[in-house]
Protein backbone atom coordinates (compact mmCIF):
# COMPACT_ATOMS: atom_id res chain seq x y z
CA UNK A 1 0.00 0.00 0.00
CA UNK A 2 1.25 3.47 -0.81
CA UNK A 3 0.15 7.07 -0.56
CA UNK A 4 0.02 8.96 -3.85
CA UNK A 5 -0.22 12.74 -3.97
CA UNK A 6 -0.88 14.40 -7.30
CA UNK A 7 -0.51 18.08 -8.04
CA UNK A 8 -1.32 20.08 -11.14
CA UNK A 9 2.02 21.85 -10.79
CA UNK A 10 0.47 25.25 -10.15
CA UNK A 11 1.61 26.63 -6.83
CA UNK A 12 1.57 30.06 -5.28
CA UNK A 13 4.47 32.49 -5.43
CA UNK A 14 4.92 32.14 -1.65
CA UNK A 15 5.13 28.34 -1.93
CA UNK A 16 7.87 28.48 -4.56
CA UNK A 17 9.75 31.22 -2.69
CA UNK A 18 9.76 29.01 0.40
CA UNK A 19 11.01 26.00 -1.59
CA UNK A 20 13.79 28.09 -3.15
CA UNK A 21 14.79 29.48 0.26
CA UNK A 22 14.92 25.92 1.63
CA UNK A 23 17.11 24.79 -1.28
CA UNK A 24 19.53 27.69 -0.83
CA UNK A 25 19.80 27.00 2.92
CA UNK A 26 20.07 23.19 2.60
CA UNK A 27 23.54 22.91 4.14
CA UNK A 28 22.56 25.11 7.07
CA UNK A 29 19.52 22.91 7.77
CA UNK A 30 21.66 19.78 7.59
CA UNK A 31 23.92 21.24 10.31
CA UNK A 32 21.06 22.54 12.47
CA UNK A 33 17.63 21.23 11.38
CA UNK A 34 15.72 23.34 13.92
CA UNK A 35 17.05 26.64 12.59
CA UNK A 36 14.61 29.26 11.39
CA UNK A 37 14.03 29.57 7.64
CA UNK A 38 15.37 32.94 6.55
CA UNK A 39 14.04 34.95 3.65
CA UNK A 40 17.06 35.02 1.35
CA UNK A 41 15.44 37.48 -1.07
CA UNK A 42 15.03 40.11 1.64
CA UNK A 43 18.49 39.50 3.13
CA UNK A 44 20.24 39.74 -0.23
CA UNK A 45 18.29 42.87 -1.19
CA UNK A 46 19.22 44.57 2.10
CA UNK A 47 22.87 43.54 1.72
CA UNK A 48 22.92 44.87 -1.85
CA UNK A 49 21.44 48.18 -0.71
CA UNK A 50 24.08 48.46 2.03
CA UNK A 51 26.85 47.67 -0.46
CA UNK A 52 25.54 50.34 -2.82
CA UNK A 53 25.52 52.88 0.03
CA UNK A 54 29.12 51.97 0.91
CA UNK A 55 30.09 52.19 -2.76
CA UNK A 56 28.49 55.61 -3.06
CA UNK A 57 30.21 56.68 0.18
CA UNK A 58 33.56 55.45 -1.14
CA UNK A 59 33.17 57.28 -4.44
CA UNK A 60 32.09 60.54 -2.76
CA UNK A 61 34.91 60.32 -0.22
CA UNK A 62 37.31 59.57 -3.05
CA UNK A 63 36.31 62.71 -4.94
CA UNK A 64 36.36 64.87 -1.80
CA UNK A 65 39.59 63.62 -0.22
CA UNK A 66 41.30 61.98 -3.14
CA UNK A 67 41.31 58.32 -4.04
CA UNK A 68 43.55 56.93 -1.34
CA UNK A 69 44.25 53.22 -1.05
CA UNK A 70 41.58 52.68 1.61
CA UNK A 71 38.84 54.22 -0.53
CA UNK A 72 39.92 52.33 -3.63
CA UNK A 73 39.88 49.07 -1.65
CA UNK A 74 36.41 49.90 -0.29
CA UNK A 75 35.15 50.59 -3.81
CA UNK A 76 36.65 47.35 -5.19
CA UNK A 77 35.25 45.25 -2.33
CA UNK A 78 31.80 46.81 -2.79
CA UNK A 79 31.85 46.19 -6.55
CA UNK A 80 32.84 42.53 -6.06
CA UNK A 81 30.20 42.10 -3.34
CA UNK A 82 27.52 43.71 -5.54
CA UNK A 83 28.50 41.45 -8.44
CA UNK A 84 28.33 38.25 -6.39
CA UNK A 85 25.09 39.09 -4.58
CA UNK A 86 23.53 40.54 -7.72
CA UNK A 87 24.20 37.27 -9.54
CA UNK A 88 22.76 35.27 -6.63
CA UNK A 89 19.60 37.41 -6.57
CA UNK A 90 19.27 37.08 -10.35
CA UNK A 91 19.62 33.28 -10.11
CA UNK A 92 17.00 33.06 -7.37
CA UNK A 93 14.56 35.25 -9.31
CA UNK A 94 15.14 33.17 -12.44
CA UNK A 95 14.42 29.95 -10.49
CA UNK A 96 11.22 31.50 -9.11
CA UNK A 97 10.07 32.64 -12.55
CA UNK A 98 10.82 29.19 -13.99
CA UNK A 99 8.88 27.48 -11.18
CA UNK A 100 5.88 29.77 -11.67
CA UNK A 101 5.83 29.06 -15.42
CA UNK A 102 6.21 25.28 -15.01
CA UNK A 103 2.74 23.72 -15.07
CA UNK A 104 3.78 20.08 -15.38
CA UNK A 105 1.91 17.55 -13.27
CA UNK A 106 3.77 16.34 -10.16
CA UNK A 107 3.22 12.96 -8.48
CA UNK A 108 4.73 12.10 -5.09
CA UNK A 109 4.38 8.47 -4.06
CA UNK A 110 5.18 7.46 -0.48
CA UNK A 111 5.49 3.77 0.35
CA UNK A 112 7.32 1.44 2.74
CA UNK A 113 10.51 1.76 0.67
CA UNK A 114 10.69 5.54 0.52
CA UNK A 115 9.52 8.58 -1.42
CA UNK A 116 9.28 8.82 -5.19
CA UNK A 117 8.92 12.18 -6.90
CA UNK A 118 7.93 12.31 -10.56
CA UNK A 119 7.43 15.41 -12.66
CA UNK A 120 5.57 14.90 -15.93
CA UNK A 121 8.01 14.80 -18.89
CA UNK A 122 10.99 15.28 -16.63
CA UNK A 123 12.60 14.76 -13.30
CA UNK A 124 12.38 11.55 -11.26
CA UNK A 125 13.74 11.33 -7.72
CA UNK A 126 13.80 8.27 -5.48
CA UNK A 127 14.61 8.62 -1.81
CA UNK A 128 14.75 5.56 0.45
CA UNK A 129 13.79 5.97 4.09
CA UNK A 130 17.34 5.04 5.11
CA UNK A 131 18.54 8.11 3.17
CA UNK A 132 16.13 10.54 4.88
CA UNK A 133 18.03 12.54 7.49
CA UNK A 134 14.86 14.25 8.77
CA UNK A 135 11.58 15.80 7.68
CA UNK A 136 10.85 19.42 8.42
CA UNK A 137 7.50 21.21 8.54
CA UNK A 138 7.63 24.77 7.19
CA UNK A 139 4.76 27.22 6.74
CA UNK A 140 3.89 26.07 3.18
CA UNK A 141 5.61 22.69 2.72
CA UNK A 142 6.63 19.47 4.44
CA UNK A 143 10.17 18.78 3.26
CA UNK A 144 12.23 15.58 3.42
CA UNK A 145 16.00 16.18 3.61
CA UNK A 146 18.55 13.52 2.68
CA UNK A 147 22.27 13.36 3.35
CA UNK A 148 23.00 13.22 -0.38
CA UNK A 149 21.58 16.63 -1.39
CA UNK A 150 18.08 15.48 -2.29
CA UNK A 151 15.18 17.57 -1.01
CA UNK A 152 11.59 16.51 -1.69
CA UNK A 153 8.78 18.84 -0.67
CA UNK A 154 5.07 18.12 -0.33
CA UNK A 155 2.49 20.88 -0.07
CA UNK A 156 1.51 21.38 3.56
CA UNK A 157 -2.14 20.72 2.68
CA UNK A 158 -1.13 17.03 2.52
CA UNK A 159 0.80 17.04 5.80
CA UNK A 160 -1.82 15.12 7.81
CA UNK A 161 -2.12 12.38 5.16
CA UNK A 162 1.65 11.98 4.95
CA UNK A 163 2.19 11.96 8.72
CA UNK A 164 -0.68 9.48 9.25
CA UNK A 165 0.77 7.18 6.58
CA UNK A 166 4.24 7.32 8.16
CA UNK A 167 2.84 6.58 11.64
CA UNK A 168 0.54 3.78 10.47
CA UNK A 169 3.38 2.01 8.66
CA UNK A 170 5.89 2.43 11.50
CA UNK A 171 8.37 4.34 9.35
CA UNK A 172 11.14 5.85 11.45
CA UNK A 173 11.82 9.44 10.46
CA UNK A 174 12.59 12.45 12.62
CA UNK A 175 10.05 15.22 12.05
CA UNK A 176 10.81 18.80 13.00
CA UNK A 177 8.17 21.50 12.91
CA UNK A 178 8.07 25.25 12.79
CA UNK A 179 9.39 27.07 15.87
CA UNK A 180 7.28 25.91 18.79
CA UNK A 181 6.52 22.54 17.15
CA UNK A 182 7.73 19.58 19.22
CA UNK A 183 10.17 17.31 17.40
CA UNK A 184 8.81 13.77 17.12
CA UNK A 185 9.80 10.49 15.57
CA UNK A 186 6.89 9.78 13.24
CA UNK A 187 7.32 6.03 13.43
CA UNK A 188 6.74 5.97 17.19
CA UNK A 189 3.27 6.20 18.66
Role assignments for model-derived ranges:
Residues 130-138:
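K/E-rich alpha-helical interaction surfaces of small helical-bundle regulatory domains
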Residues 2, 114, 139-141:
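A generic structural signal for beta-strand entry/edge sites
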Residues 1-51:
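N-terminal membrane-targeting/pre-transmembrane regions
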Residues 128-129, 145:
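Structured extramembrane domains adjacent to transmembrane segments
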Residues 141-189:
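A membrane-cytosol interface segment of integral membrane proteins
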Residues 36-102:
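Alpha-helical transmembrane spans
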Residues 3, 125-127, 150-152:
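Short beta-strand segments
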Residues 85-126, 134:
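Conserved beta-hairpin
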Amino acid sequence: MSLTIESDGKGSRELYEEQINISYQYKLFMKRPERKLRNQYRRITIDLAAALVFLLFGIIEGFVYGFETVFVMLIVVCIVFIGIYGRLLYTMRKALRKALEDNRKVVVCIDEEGIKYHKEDGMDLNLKWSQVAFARVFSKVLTFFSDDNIVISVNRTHEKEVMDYIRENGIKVRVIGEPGFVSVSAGEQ
